[in-house]
Amino acid sequence: MTAKIFKRYQEAFLFCVCACIDLLEKIREKEYQKTRRFKHNITTLAANILQEIYKLVSQDELLKGPKQLERIKEIIHSNSDEAGLTFLKILKNANLMKAEFDVYEIFNLDSPYLDFANHPAHKIILLTINPFWLEFIEKKIYINIDSFSDTIYADYKTISVTLCHIFENATKYIAKNTELHIYFTSDDNYINIIFEMVSLKVYEDEIQKIFLENYSGILAKEYDLAGNGLGMYIVKKLVEFNNGKITFLNNCNGTAFKYDGIEYEKIK
């Protein structure tokens, strides 16, 4: 082998090595970002739970040794309404924490295990919306869930996580003193679950973008309501895992308007 040919092989080898190193760095950075995001979300939710507990029962009360149990019972008994609200808030954050673990596990497995079975669509909605009642009540939202007796063939865990993210978004973006209408239709082999509400306006050219990873809406960012841009991305992925699809319709019936200086519209 001549020196010239050897040099070419050497250059090609070095190029491949550099490309591999660059690829590995990108993979490492992506995995680090996912882990950091997961850790941040779990830490935030855990902090929310502790905050709600300490608002009801102060840390000083928890330092009373053997008497702490009796004292906690007294506080709950004398503040039953507040205790009930605390329970709902803890339940919501615990559900969101479970959803975070489920999503992290599913998205990091090459072939996630999905347990498909028939589940009553109406019951799944009721079970999943329960932890969010309080926030809807605080915003004076009238929740109208139509009756429906059909079942959906789906993986319960991923569908529950999907609905969790939908309701979490709804509590953030729905306009006060309005209605959340959830109804069902049957279409060939599909069951359609439709969420209709007056929500923060989404511009026409954003409709497809809201399903992209790390994308937050223009007005969501402007009004400081944006999350981490994962909610609808996760929803779309999990719906597709269940052989379904999701669509977003904005400005239904030409209902765009302003409330408290914020732009809203009816969406489905």
Language model: regions and residue ranges:
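Conserved DHp (HisKA) dimerization/phosphotransfer helix of two-component histidine kinases, i.e.
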Residues: 48-138
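Short beta-strand/loop element within the Bergerat-fold HATPase_c
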Residues: 177-189
